[in-house]
Amino acid sequence: MSDQISIIAPDDWHVHLRDGEMLNQVVAHTARRFQRAIVMPNLRPPVTTVAAAQAYRDRIQAACPADLEFTPLMTAYLTDSIAPAELETGFREGVFAAAKLYPANATTNSAAGVTDLLQIDPVLETMARIGMPLLIHGEVTDPEIDIFDREAAFIERHLEPLRERHPELKVVLEHITTEQAVQYVSSADRHLAATITPHHLHINRNAMFAGGLRSDFYCLPVAKRECHRQALRRAATSGDPSFFLGTDTAPHERSSKESACGCAGIFNAPFALESYAQVFDQEGALEHFEAFTSLNGPAFYKLPANTHRITLQRRDHLVPELVNGLVPFHAGEILSWAVANAPDQVQL
């Protein structure tokens, strides 16, 4: 059993870096572990123009410590009225790496999202033509659909018809949580991929209610039954190039998590890579770890893999209860892998 693994420097294909003071608090945690990151556009107001994306990218780079090599990859927030020309300009100028589809009111800051997929077909046609990936929060918002069934319903009702209408469109089904999503992506062609978070590999829905209401485990999509968690673990560790790393790290102040109407999101950036490594180790699949963290994502986005390497060591360490005042995923738990030469708690 190896006590050390070396991998090509990884990327994170789904992050929420927030803005303002929260951006200053969290960006270095992503930048210390990942060389590139796909940055979600659900700010207030959302990032819907090239100029807004450029300005947000500038703020991210200004907040990132100068000694870290980190490239934020910006995304456009799709609305019912967004212009195809705006997306094409941003993509061709290298400002937009992808566009994000939020069904209206599906998750945090998604009120301005798309209400009717047919209405944005001209946008999707443009994206397919220029090779711009579509990133999807794949849940229906129909209140009659149980929250635990909303991902499976989205695939059947919306994703499959969308892909039939736009067969050449590159699509990432983000933060998948169900066995149905695993099966759908596994059986699809090269134009469809999926990201998987560390928390959905570690917890099932029981975690939210263990001994009380555990708001730190509340995220969207919500964690599902144990059978779905096991399907995700098999997919992530399989070596299938359709699946790659996307943490969906989503920090919130404690007052926003612990309230009568708490926010969805798990802040996992500080120890995400170590969290993934533990899963691959437990599944006896460390030989596929580098592909999931460092190769499959760049291949899908048609970007070169990073050139330098990082090393992880088998070393038990305690995850702190708080990091910069925020509760990290695995708070108070012991992880069995650590990035070499990195302190157990990054001081920023």
UniProtKB/Swiss-Prot annotation:
Its EC number is 3.5.2.3. InterPro entries: Amidohydro-rel, DHOdimr, Dihydroorotase_CS, Metal_Hydrolase. Zn(2+) 2 binds at residues 100, 137, 175. Catalyzes the reversible cyclization of carbamoyl aspartate to dihydroorotate. The lineage of its organism: Bacteria, Bacillati, Cyanobacteriota, Cyanophyceae, Synechococcales. It comes from Synechococcus sp. (strain CC9605). The gene is pyrC. It holds the Pfam family Amidohydro_1. It catalyses: (S)-dihydroorotate + H2O = N-carbamoyl-L-aspartate + H(+). This is Dihydroorotase. One of its GO terms (molecular function) is dihydroorotase activity. Its cofactor is Zn(2+). Keywords: Hydrolase, Metal-binding, Pyrimidine biosynthesis, Zinc.
